[in-house]
Amino acid sequence: MKRVITILGAVSAAAALLASCGGNSPATAVDSTGHKCYSGIYPHLAYYNSQGECGTGAVVPWQNDLWVITYSPHMPFGSDDKLYQITPDLTETARPESIGGTPANRMIHLPSNQLFIGPYAIDADKNVRVLEWEKVPGRHTGMAAHLTDPENRILLATMEAGFYDIDVHTLEAVELYKDGNQKRKEGFKGELCTLFPGYHGKGFYSGQGVAVFSNNGEESELAQRQFDIPSGCLAEWDGKDWKVVRRNQFTEITGPGGIYGNPNPGTDPIWALGWDYRSVILAIREAGKGWSYYRLPKASFAYDGAHGWNTEWPRIRNVGNEGETELLMTMHGMFWHFPETFTTANSAGIRPRGAYLKVIGDFTNWNGRLVFGCDDSAQSEFLNKRKQKGRIGGPGQSNSNLWFGTPETPDNVGPVTAAGSVWLRDNVKAGEPSDAFLFNGWDNRCAWVANRSANDTEITFEIDKAGNGQWSEFRKVSVPAGSSLFVPFEPTDDAVWIRAVSSADIVSDLTFVLAEQETRDTEPDPMFKGIATLKENADSKGFMYGLPNQRRALGILASTADGEQYYELDGEMNMRAKTDDETADYIRDKFAIPHGVVEVDEGSVLIVDAKGRRWRLPLGADGYAEKIAGDEVRICREVATERDLLSLCGTFYELPAENADGYAKVRPVCSHNYVINDYASYRGMMMFTGIDHSAAKGNPHIVFSEDGKAAVWAGAIDDLWKMGKPTGHGGPLVDTEVKAGVPSDPFLIGFYDRRDMYLSHSGSGSVTFKVEVDPSGDGQWFTYGEYEVAAGQTVEHRFPRAFQARWIRVTTSEDTKATALFEYR
């Protein structure tokens, strides 16, 4: 495609300079660009602002350079955020024309040969013009081809439903609808968005005679606490009137033309990405047909939240090399392959590629490398507070960075295990099919179906084998009143989409859980060599804090053989001892590891969340309970904006904010035998303290202080997938006094590989153990099986590969002392 060539330019000597960081020599982090690089992150490219968040709004190659904009969380009238120009030798310049704000819009306007990015228009000679905030106030979120004069004009949308008609030559703007922030500035007391439901705008695109806009939030106090209320909107405008298309949270809107706009706007489809508390929603608008909908599973639930703040900007974007089309989609923590030919008649080809932990606002292919613009370190932490973090706060100054990878990076991150529902506490009508749910792309698949009604039903699963809209009967299952059922699928069951039909009116839950075969083992990647283990004491430890007030360094209060010493790590990764008692005292006070915020017993780690809910996580290697009790290891910290990283008993977990359902949706990432004293994000990197200096020699990921007495590990958060597959053991009951019919606490079982269960009791007669699962963490329990356990007997059960669920619990038929243990190998 010519348009791909226009944006990428020729791949020349610049491509050689931008070789992978994997080309580092064994003892240095300097790569072939001459810059230090840690797992694809160049510290010198990091950007800062003075607000509570510094996210990446857009990254676009233009005239051989990479153009990047950052945003503050709510600055509709400008800020100190910048437009950055990065040359192929990785020289970064903050353009003097920068006016900041909260921008994430970008479009290449081919007729005028300009890049529009944020409030800037950049011509073929790299001259930058500015759309002043006085003329176009608001948080710029999207641009779309003009409905009647696409050669000379462009449409701009703001997050608070402001819309402008802009002359691409003069940049004169006609206000179509006033931005909500501007209305409030002028004295308006109502909601920010009044044109349609929801607020917190995201996507904007045009075609088929309409402009389509999305928002993904709700402006209410309840939306800041409860994730499953009505929220968001997909709407379209015909040039005169607005029409609500669907009342759900939506983000990206695009089409085959991507950043350029559709080449055949009258007939090309429009795609939109959204979600609700059930699953991801994929919408498509086709000429002459209107809107159709499909559902996909969520790899991560950390993006949920009715306020819409946790998503940033998911995208569908061409990342193919010159002359190629390869669409990459990001949504709810998953990289997806998206087919450029996607229509309702040809819907095959969506495929999960890999799960990730970074928070990504935009991405592109630049000279053969994928570049992800991230939202890494937010000073405010917003609503993401919890007891297990203690008094720790965010960094002193918000900062983020770019993450460079290869075209294969999306395939080489985390496993694509995911879950989603088509029905969740829903009133289901007899004979009415559910939405289509993606079925192909995973090795191990199952469904959990529940009939919460007083009448029996038969559920018919139907499949669309080829993605052509032709449905056929696949399987029937009977679900009596008040019962639930585990429905495993075989790896050979082949279809693009699956849906369900009930024979009776019922209240039902139907959740699919899908997983690929685990290919990782328990051995960590050599990049982690030198982090202290349970068998080796650390030569240096320390607490870390990103410094405020434009110091742009990482403060480290280190513990060494010589005692306590304060260090600073700068943007060139030089670590020097400093005398700064004020900062050292601040770190000592605010960043101490909290005591007693979790309970480790002989079977599990017990966590009680902010809502009083009880959760149990597996144990790891012997020795971690002592480390936790002694406050030697950080338990919980935000290292990617608006979600936490939990570290317990040798396992790292992704932990959504409480407003995204928190511990209910926790996800294990990796297991290990390391004793990591502290972890933090800095300039886009993942940082660890707790280093065995002798073992660390020669590892380019280890940064030593100039005096050689302290050290830290530096990499990327998605390196954690290489630390070792999740393992663990334990259970919710260990010779525990139980009452008949009272369920145990939930115990995590999701995301592990080989899983075994052991049931026993101390009673003199037989006891029946009822085993239930919550497949997605949504609080709906399904019966997996009932096991009669004789006195003195231990019943062992290995879960089949098709079995997938997040939580498990057991209930006994008698009062007794019961044991329910699990081994995850």
Locate the predicted segments by residue.
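Repeated scaffold domains used in trafficking and secretory/extracellular systems
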Residues: 51-58, 98-112, 135-152, 181-208, ...
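Noncatalytic modules at the cell exterior or secretory-pathway interfaces
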Residues: 491-508, 800-816
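Beta-propeller domains
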Residues: 67-100, 118-132, 166-167, 177, ...
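Loop/turn-rich, solvent-exposed surfaces of beta-rich toroidal or solenoidal domains
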Residues: 270-272, 280, 296-343, 437-440, ...
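Beta-propeller blade signature
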Residues: 81-88, 171, 224-240, 282-288, ...
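Blade-level signature of beta-propeller repeat domains, shared across WD40, Kelch, NHL, RCC1
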Residues: 358, 362-425, 678-737, 748
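A short helix->beta-strand "capping" segment at the edge of beta-propeller domains
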Residues: 29-52, 527-537
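Beta-strand-rich domains and repeat architectures in extracellular enzymes and scaffolds
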Residues: 45-81, 100-107, 445, 537-560
